[in-house]
Amino acid sequence: MGGQSKVFTLAEVSNHNNAKDCWLIISGKVYNVTKFLEDHPGGGEVLLSATGKDATDDFEDIGHSSSARAMLDEYYVGDIDSSTIPTKVKYTPPKQPHYNQDKTTEFIVKLLQFLVPLIILGVAFGVHFYTKQSA
């Protein structure tokens, strides 16, 4: 890796996306891994699926050995113009609406739904019981 390295745009690197011409972007550097496709332990399809984007996360998630990282040097062709790589949008879930933070009103409603029928039943039973004794 001596001298000035060539700087590529994402569009330029994205053109190299097949089994006869395969380039990857890893940690801001561009690698021509075409010759390595057949020898890659995970298969060439794994490498081809990582073309046209920043493959750094894919590379790091696998947990490559130090010898695999050293092999990258022989496939190095230049650097990527980082301004051409789209920024990752971090997903933030929408905040949940807080309809009823004070649960006391909900509790009172449930309590009344339980007690009102019992009170009606008790009154009906009492009326029936007292009218039966009087007669």
Swiss-Prot record:
<dbReference type="InterPro" id="IPR001199">
    <property type="entry name" value="Cyt_B5-like_heme/steroid-bd"/>
</dbReference>
<keyword id="KW-0408">Iron</keyword>
<dbReference type="InterPro" id="IPR050668">
    <property type="entry name" value="Cytochrome_b5"/>
</dbReference>
<feature type="domain" description="Cytochrome b5 heme-binding">
    <location>
        <begin position="5"/>
        <end position="81"/>
    </location>
</feature>
<keyword id="KW-0472">Membrane</keyword>
<dbReference type="GO" id="GO:0046872">
    <property type="term" value="F:metal ion binding"/>
</dbReference>
<dbReference type="InterPro" id="IPR036400">
    <property type="entry name" value="Cyt_B5-like_heme/steroid_sf"/>
</dbReference>
<comment type="similarity">
    <text>Belongs to the cytochrome b5 family.</text>
</comment>
<protein>
    <recommendedName>
        <fullName>Cytochrome b5, seed isoform</fullName>
    </recommendedName>
</protein>
<keyword id="KW-0812">Transmembrane</keyword>
<feature type="binding site" description="axial binding residue">
    <location>
        <position position="40"/>
    </location>
    <ligand>
        <name>heme</name>
    </ligand>
</feature>
<feature type="transmembrane region" description="Helical">
    <location>
        <begin position="107"/>
        <end position="127"/>
    </location>
</feature>
<keyword id="KW-0813">Transport</keyword>
<keyword id="KW-0349">Heme</keyword>
<comment type="function">
    <text>Cytochrome b5 is a membrane bound hemoprotein which function as an electron carrier for several membrane bound oxygenases. May play a key role in the modification by desaturation of fatty acids in the endoplasmic reticulum, which in the developing seed is utilized for membrane synthesis and in the developmentally regulated production of large amounts of storage lipids.</text>
</comment>
<dbReference type="InterPro" id="IPR018506">
    <property type="entry name" value="Cyt_B5_heme-BS"/>
</dbReference>
<feature type="binding site" description="axial binding residue">
    <location>
        <position position="64"/>
    </location>
    <ligand>
        <name>heme</name>
    </ligand>
</feature>
<keyword id="KW-1133">Transmembrane helix</keyword>
<dbReference type="GO" id="GO:0016020">
    <property type="term" value="C:membrane"/>
</dbReference>
<keyword id="KW-0492">Microsome</keyword>
<dbReference type="GO" id="GO:0043231">
    <property type="term" value="C:intracellular membrane-bounded organelle"/>
</dbReference>
<keyword id="KW-0249">Electron transport</keyword>
<dbReference type="Pfam" id="PF00173">
    <property type="entry name" value="Cyt-b5"/>
</dbReference>
<dbReference type="GO" id="GO:0005789">
    <property type="term" value="C:endoplasmic reticulum membrane"/>
</dbReference>
<dbReference type="GO" id="GO:0020037">
    <property type="term" value="F:heme binding"/>
</dbReference>
<keyword id="KW-0479">Metal-binding</keyword>
<keyword id="KW-0256">Endoplasmic reticulum</keyword>
